[in-house]
Each structure stands twice: as structure tokens, then as C-alpha cells.
């Protein structure tokens, strides 16, 4: 029988990385509104603090923590901070990442950085919080991957392959952690109208995107936050090892 309480996160404690803006910010606010206590992590400390202020104004509990996800030391400090402030970690949302288009003849440092942002940080932070989740009977790890993981395009070698690696981590970590009652899933967003996308999209590009989108609009950060809430809630207690594409049914390309 359906129970709306299964979409609540009351009593849960969550870390959300890259939560100072865009999708991560919306996930943090949505989770807090659903009852979770959240650590808002971002490389931009001011942005993280602003999100915490918004959550507190809504009556939620949140703490800000600056973190450069390419630093193992800072990831470890983030996990320690969350445990010290929240007492436990039930949910990790690995939203921070990056990379973007790079030419094939890119320096190897650029190629490595895509993997540091999208793969190594996700895996290491998961390693850090999984034992804490196990102590408390289980938990949920969610990563924001990309439709680029399954698609092909010019100048996307480093970004797309790193996101494909992250997606495959989801599938394999679900097996590694399932016996500990830790679920692992991912979301592959389509074109989401974050401030970052709004700064580069033109009306012509948007119209081209809409031609390939059965639901004739581009996504909003709340669309991804809603999917994240489901996947991290008790309503998805038998969902693990999955990548959920949220794209209005289409494939949008920024070219």
C-alpha cells in the first residue's frame, strides 16, 4: 500500500557535494524540506553558507563545509565534519564534478583531472562514508553522472569516459555494498537550466534541443532533485545499481 511517508527523509543525515548552486543546491533544499539534516559541501564556501542560510530560513537543519573534491585530505575532512555535526551519515549525494569538452590533444593533466573530478572523488568519498552507513544499518549513495556516458560527441573523450566510469562504478559498488544494506544509484540529467547553462545557451541552441525532447521543455534543477529524493528515500528501498535518465525523454546537445 502506498505511504507518502516513504518519500520523507525524517531523521536522515545527508552529505551533498557541489551543493552551492544548481542541481546540488536544489537537492540540498529538497532533502532538508523532506526532513533530512544536511551538510552542504562546495568548493565555494560563501555559496555553501548561502544555501545553509536558505535551508535554515525554511526551518531545516544544515551545515556548510568547504571541500575541494580532488583532495583526498579534504574529502576525509568532509566525512569527519559530517559525522561530527550530524552524528551519522545515511545518504551521500555525489553531485560535484566537472570537466567539459576538451580536444583530443589535451594535456594528460586535463585528462587526469576529469577522472579526479568525476571518478576518484566519488569512489573515495564512498569509501569514507560506507563504514559509517554500515554501522547504522545501511544507507544510500547517489551520484550525478551524465548522458554523455552513453553518447558520443566531438571533444568529449575525457568527460564522457570519466562519466561512463562513474556509471559503471555505480553498478559494481551496488554489488560490493548491497550486503551491507547500502544502495548505490545514479542520475543522468539532460539539459538542466542551471545558471551555468543559462550563461552559454542561445535561443537557437534551445530550440534545437527542444526538437529532440519529446516533453517540450528543458529541465529544471527541481526535476533532478525530485528524482534524487525518490532514489534516496524508503520508497526506493529495492532500487540499486541503476542509472536513472532524467531528460524529458530526449537527448540534448550543446552544439
Curated annotation (Swiss-Prot):
Regulation: Inhibited by N-bromosuccinimide, diethyl pyrocarbonate, and some metal ions such as Co(2+), Fe(2+) and Cu(2+).
SUPFAM superfamilies in the record: NAD(P)-binding Rossmann-fold domains
Record field: catalytic activity: cholate + NAD(+) = 3alpha,12alpha-dihydroxy-7-oxo-5beta-cholanate + NADH + H(+); chenodeoxycholate + NAD(+) = 7-oxolithocholate + NADH + H(+); taurochenodeoxycholate + NAD(+) = 7-oxotaurolithocholate + NADH + H(+); taurocholate + NAD(+) = 7-oxo-taurodeoxycholate + NADH + H(+)
Binding positions for NAD(+) per the UniProt entry: 23, 42-43, 68-69, 95, 159, 163, 192-194
Resulting phenotype, residue 159 to F: Loss of activity
GO BP term, example: lipid catabolic process
pH dependence of activity: Optimum pH is 8.5. The enzyme is stable between pH 8 and 9.
MF terms (GO), sorted A to Z: chenodeoxycholate 7-alpha-dehydrogenase (NAD+) activity; cholate 7-alpha-dehydrogenase (NAD+) activity; identical protein binding; NAD binding
Pfam families in UniProt: adh_short_C2 (PF13561)
Marked site: Lowers pKa of active site Tyr: 163
Catalytic residues (positions): 159 (proton acceptor)
Domain of life (superkingdom): Bacteria
GO cellular component: cytosol; protein-containing complex
Its EC number(s): 1.1.1.159
InterPro entries listed in its UniProt record: NAD(P)-bd_dom_sf (IPR036291), Sc_DH/Rdtase_CS (IPR020904), SDR (IPR050259), SDR_fam (IPR002347)
Keyword tags: Bile acid catabolism, Lipid degradation, Lipid metabolism, NAD, Oxidoreductase, Steroid metabolism
Site (described: Transition state stabilizer): 146
Subunit structure: Homotetramer.
NCBIfam families: PRK06113.1, PRK07231.1
Entry's family note: Belongs to the short-chain dehydrogenases/reductases (SDR) family.
Protein task: 7alpha-hydroxysteroid dehydrogenase involved in the metabolism of bile acids. Catalyzes the NAD(+)-dependent oxidation of the 7alpha-hydroxy group of 7alpha-hydroxysteroids, such as the major human bile acids cholate and chenodeoxycholate, to the corresponding 7-oxosteroids. To a lesser extent, can also act on taurochenodeoxycholate, taurocholate and glycocholate. Can also use glycochenodeoxycholate as substrate. Is not able to use NADP(+) instead of NAD(+) as the electron acceptor.
Alphabetical list of PANTHER family matching this protein: 3-OXOACYL-(ACYL-CARRIER-PROTEIN) REDUCTASE (PTHR42879), 3-OXOACYL-[ACYL-CARRIER-PROTEIN] REDUCTASE FABG (PTHR42879:SF2)
Protein name per Swiss-Prot or TrEMBL: 7alpha-hydroxysteroid dehydrogenase
Native source organism of the sequence: Escherichia coli (strain K12)
Taxonomic classification: Bacteria, Pseudomonadati, Pseudomonadota, Gammaproteobacteria, Enterobacterales
